[in-house]
Amino acid sequence: GSALLGYSRFHRYGLDIVAAFDKHPDVIGRVIHGREVLHISKLPHLARRMRVHVGIITVPADAAQEVANLMVSGGIRAIWNFAPAALDVPEGVIMQREDLYSSLGVLLQRLNAVLDPLHSQ
């Protein structure tokens, strides 16, 4: 999640990350790439107040559905999901899942083809 917070080119695509959330006391209150990390319970209220349309999930799989539910209750209409989990959201909420494991598999397969072209055919 902190890598996405630090990515400065999202604004070119109309995305401005306005807040970060966590539930761990040792993270809450820290400032990461200029944004204070807030307790996850504040997400719905802040999302509604700031009219946030897109939420980004970068939590472990077992926490992802809870975060998605909070986003939906805050009026978020599109979720960019980096968690390794399929999430259930209501109709009308757009979900884009980034499967890092599949991407890694493709990358390694392509690397093997370059490193050992005779055995990859």
Predicted segment positions?
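Glycine-rich adenosine-cofactor-binding loop
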Residues: 1-14, 18-24
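A glycine-biased structural micro-motif
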Residues: 27-30
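Phosphate-bearing ligand-interacting subdomains
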Residues: 33-120
